[in-house]
Structures are given as structure tokens and as C-alpha cells.
């Protein structure tokens, strides 16, 4: 018997990584899970190294980042690797979630892995926001001011919660201290949830492009899918290094290279690009509390997908109407991202409201309606046989 099967710990790892049975028809859209694991490892390694040289003090934070860039051996590489991996993390998780929505991987028996995945996504957004503040440039300061101020929309307790988050009456040294402590902790929390996600997925088994049960035709994870994952890992590293070495600031904001100054407001206050769709939803609602509720609901509404999708067939492989609807949803989400970075002026205000209505309508109206219509078509088709 092989050593990996004799030892109890190695046997458990072997059942998840090497000998794990997988459907035989998985395509490259199933490779984003391994890329997300790679992103998490890179973030942990670079983040711990950066924390050794970073100073979480309002007067020293910006200078400590510049010290890392100029004086620490390969500090520029570590800092840019950490910043760009955050962007690639979101690229991969958006692609991963989009694949799950398209192929119906949230349906029974994979409701638990999907729910844990949505929680991971929410934690990732919070972690990225706190990390962005730590640079303490202009956009960091005003981003923290604006985003934390949204909590004040909560009736009765809002103002007190904002002061608790800031550690005072404005963004300052206590804010950096607590954000740094939480930002250091959150990746380990994410790692725990990623492990829970993997356990839940191992219990239910992976879905496949056809949306059918694949118990009769499976392959071991190694060597078939491990080598398949390596192809996208190398492609990922190629794109990643191109950004780190040649365009490290392409996905960032130039205002964050200006030290934080509470007396000077930037021309426009926008979050990082990966949060722009939800920022557009926030701005589409004139009422402050309504905007906050809509922004949070835009994330949490993903949890109801297993309920609102009434289709008797998993995935969109054989559903042309659902394919078209999903295409509109993706285009709408990308348009929300564009609207999140433009100034609030006509016609962008109305366009943002239309896109927000379509976003929520997709989950609450269009998906249940289209899935019901397609069920009727499938039923009629089965009667003709």
C-alpha cells in the first residue's frame, strides 16, 4: 500500500487532492478554484512579509510603504505582487462564480458549497477594503471616510458604529490600527472558509458542463486534472508577471500615491475596480439607507439562487433562453462596473438605475419566470416522444 494511504493524515489529503474522483468532462472553467487557492497562498506569503516592514500609524503608514518600495530588498516586487494579486483574486472569483451560475452548480446537492462561497466573497470584499485603506494615500483616506460613513444610515445605532469603526470622530491612527489587525487576521479566516468550502464540495462532488450525474464516469484528480490545472497556473503567472513587472499600477489609482490629506478632497472618490458594480448600485438609489441596503442585498441575493431557479435541468447547456438571459446579465454587470467610476450626472444616473433594476430583476423575476417556461417546454417535448 502506498505511503499516502497508510498514514491517516496523508490519506485524508490524498482523498481530497490526488485520488479525488472528478467528472470526466470538466473544461477549463473548472480551473479557477486552483487559481483562487494560488492567489490566497501568494497573498498570505506577500502579506506576512509586508507586515514585517509596515507601520500602522497615521503619520508613518505612507512613509513605511515608500520605505518598503525603496529600501527593502525586492520590496517593490512584494508590494506590487500583493496589490496585483488582489485584483487577480477578484478576476478569478468573478469568473468562478459566473461559471457556477451558468452551469447551475448552486443547485442541490451543492447548495452548501455555494453558500460558503458567497460568504467567502463577502469576506474577501471586506478584507480588500481594509487593505486598501492601509496605504493611507488620498484615495485610502477618503475611501475609508465615505464607505464607513455608509454605516451611519442604520437607524439609531449608525453613528455610534461609525465612531467605533474609526476609533474616533474621523479616520485616523486608531482606524489604521484596527484595520491593520483585522486585515492581517482575515486571510486566515478566508483560508478556514476555503477549507470548509472544499470539504462541502468533496461531500457533494463536482458538477460538470452537462449538468448530469457523473458517478459512472469519473477520473482521479491526479494526474489528469492536476496537470490540466498547471496549464492555467502557468497562464495565470504569465499574465500576473506582465502586470507586476511592466504595468504594476495599471489596476490601481494614481491619487493613492499622494499622502492622505483630510483638508483636500480628490476630484472623484471611487473604490478599486473590482467593487465598482456594487458602488454603482449604491449610487443608483437616492436615499442613503436604501442605497446601503441595495448594495448589501446585491451580494447576499446570490444566496437565494438555489431557491429562485426552478429549472428541472441543472445548468444552461441545453437552455437557449437562459443562455441569452445570462449573457444580458453579464453585460449588465460589466456596465455597472463602468457606471461605478463615472461622475454622477445625466445620463449615467438613469442608466445606473436601469442596470440596478435589471440586476435584481434577474434573480427575483426573470430567472424564476424563464426557468418555469423552459420546464413547460421540456415537459411538452417529453410528451412528443
Swiss-Prot record:
Cellular component aspect of the GO annotation: membrane; mitochondrial inner membrane; respiratory chain complex III
Recorded GO MF terms: metal ion binding; ubiquinol-cytochrome-c reductase activity
A Gene Ontology biological process term: mitochondrial electron transport, ubiquinol to cytochrome c
Residues that bind heme b b566: 96, 197
Transmembrane portions of the chain: 32-52, 76-98, 113-133, 179-199, 225-245, 289-309, 321-341, 348-368
Cofactor(s) the protein requires to work: heme b
Cited InterPro entries: Cyt_b/b6_C, Cyt_b/b6_C_sf, Cyt_b/b6_N, Cytb/b6-like_sf, Cytochrome_b, Cytochrome_b_C_euk/bac, Cytochrome_b_N_euk/bac, Di-haem_cyt_TM
Subcellular location: Mitochondrion inner membrane
Cofactor binding, note field: Binds 2 heme b groups non-covalently.
Pfam families: Cytochrom_B_C (PF00032), Cytochrome_B (PF00033)
Membrane topology value: Multi-pass membrane protein
Range of residues in the leader sequence: none
Main location: mitochondrion
Note: Heme 1 (or BL or b562) is low-potential and absorbs at about 562 nm, and heme 2 (or BH or b566) is high-potential and absorbs at about 566 nm.
Function noted in UniProt: Component of the ubiquinol-cytochrome c reductase complex (complex III or cytochrome b-c1 complex) that is part of the mitochondrial respiratory chain. The b-c1 complex mediates electron transfer from ubiquinol to cytochrome c. Contributes to the generation of a proton gradient across the mitochondrial membrane that is then used for ATP synthesis.
Entry similarity comment: Belongs to the cytochrome b family.
Record note on quaternary structure: Fungal cytochrome b-c1 complex contains 10 subunits; 3 respiratory subunits, 2 core proteins and 5 low-molecular weight proteins. Cytochrome b-c1 complex is a homodimer.
PANTHER family per record: CYTOCHROME B (PTHR19271:SF16)
Protein name: Cytochrome b
Species the sequence originates in: Yarrowia lipolytica (strain CLIB 122 / E 150) (Yeast)
Amino acid at each position: 500500500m502506498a505511503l499516502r494511504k497508510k498514514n491517516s493524515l496523508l490519506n485524508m489529503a490524498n482523498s481530497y487532492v490526488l485520488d479525488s474522483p472528478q467528472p470526466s468532462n470538466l473544461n477549463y472553467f473548472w480551473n479557477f478554484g486552483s487559481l483562487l487557492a494560488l492567489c490566497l497562498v501568494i497573498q498570505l506569503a506577500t502579506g506576512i512579509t509586508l507586515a514585517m516592514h509596515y507601520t500602522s500609524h497615521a503619520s508613518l503608514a505612507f512613509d513605511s510603504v515608500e520605505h518598503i518600495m525603496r529600501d527593502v530588498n525586492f520590496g517593490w516586487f512584494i508590494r506590487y505582487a500583493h496589490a496585483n494579486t488582489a485584483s487577480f483574486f477578484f478576476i478569478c472569483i468573478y469568473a468562478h462564480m459566473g461559471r457556477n451560475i451558468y452551469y447551475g452548480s448552486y443547485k442541490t446537492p451543492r447548495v452548501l458549497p455555494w453558500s460558503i462561497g458567497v460568504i467567502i466573497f463577502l469576506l474577501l470584499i471586506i478584507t480588500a477594503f481594509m487593505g486598501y485603506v492601509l496605504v493611507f494615500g488620498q484615495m485610502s483616506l477618503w475611501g475609508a471616510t465615505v464607505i464607513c460613513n455608509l454605516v451611519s444610515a442604520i437607524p439609531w445605532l449608525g453613528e455610534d458604529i461609525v465612531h467605533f469603526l474609526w476609533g474616533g470622530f474621523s479616520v485616523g491612527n486608531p482606524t489604521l490600527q484596527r484595520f491593520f489587525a483585522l486585515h492581517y487576521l482575515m486571510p486566515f479566516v478566508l483560508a478556514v472558509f476555503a477549507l470548509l468550502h472544499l470539504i462541502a464540495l468533496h461531500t457533494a462532488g463536482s458538477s460538470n458542463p452537462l449538468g448530469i450525474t457523473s458517478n459512472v464516469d469519473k477520473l482521479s484528480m491526479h494526474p489528469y486534472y492536476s496537470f490540466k490545472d498547471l496549464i492555467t497556473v502557468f497562464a495565470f503567472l504569465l499574465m500576473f508577471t506582465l502586470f507586476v513587472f511592466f504595468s504594476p499600477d495599471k489596476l490601481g489609482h494614481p491619487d493613492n500615491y499622494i499622502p492622505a490629506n483630510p483638508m483636500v478632497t480628490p476630484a472623484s472618490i471611487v473604490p478599486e475596480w473590482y467593487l465598482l458594480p456594487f458602488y454603482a448600485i449604491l449610487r443608483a438609489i437616492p436615499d442613503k439607507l436604501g442605497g446601503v441596503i441595495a448594495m448589501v442585498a446585491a451580494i447576499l441575493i446570490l444566496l437565494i439562487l438555489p431557491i429562485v431557479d426552478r429549472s428541472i435541468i441543472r445548468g444552461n447547456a441545453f437552455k437557449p433562453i437562459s443562455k441569452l438571459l445570462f449573457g444580458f446579465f453579464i453585460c449588465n454587470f460589466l456596465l455597472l462596473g463602468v457606471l461605478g467610476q463615472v461622475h454622477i450626472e445625466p445620463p449615467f444616473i438613469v442608466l445606473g438605475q436601469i442596470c440596478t433594476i435589471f440586476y435584481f430583476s434577474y434573480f427575483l423575476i426573470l430567472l424564476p419566470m424563464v426557468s418555469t417556461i423552459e420546464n413547460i417546454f421540456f415537459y411538452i417535448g417529453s410528451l412528443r416522444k
